[in-house]
Amino acid sequence: MTQFEKLDLLLREYGGTIQTFQVLNNGISKSVFYAYVKERGLEQAAHGVYVSPDTWTDTMYILHLRCNQAVFSHETALFFHDLTDREPLKYTITVRTGYNPSRLQEDGFQVYTIKKELHEVGTTTMQTSFGHAVPVYNMERTICDLLRSRKNIEMQVFQDALKQYAKCKDKNLRMLMKYAAMFHVENILRPYLEVLL
């Protein structure tokens, strides 16, 4: 089997999206890989991320590969959890404080930062519409994030999301109040919940 044939198999195995480190881990040199990229017409979707020309580009998955600490949050997380019917105009992510988000912002992503010890709280994994697994904050964390960022969020979006959350069978009010205390939004959230529940 030639190295190009091996790369064809790898590309298929990874669903048409491949990263340079995956190629190197399979014993193929960068020079052979770059010749393959040119020969097969792969597109560079991000630094070290290449996509086959016959593969639909999954922007959310590419963003996750590009910045693996990014967690989909705010309006994007609402959309994942069916707590809104509005498809986000921009994808919203949260990264740890200290990460430089300027490149992501230049590329049209809305980026929030949070201290390291709160970054992983409420993280779950969900499937994009293309079937790729990406990190997303759970419903309870998302509600708290919306309240924390209420100056940047339309209040109607928050209220509609909270109404949808109240109807959910899998809501976890105990977790919601725990997160509200952690993120210092408990006093803001409580009156909304009293009206809805």
Labelled PLM ranges:
Residues M1-G16:
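Short amphipathic alpha-helical interface segments
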Residues N26-K38:
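Short amphipathic alpha-helical interaction segments
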Residues R40-A46:
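A short, conserved structural fragment
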Residues K6, T17-Q22, V49-L197:
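Nucleic-acid-binding surface
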Residues G27-K30, Q44, Q159:
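Generic detection of intrinsically disordered/low-complexity segments and helix-coil linkers/edges
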Residues L11, L24-N25:
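Residues that cap or flank secondary-structure elements
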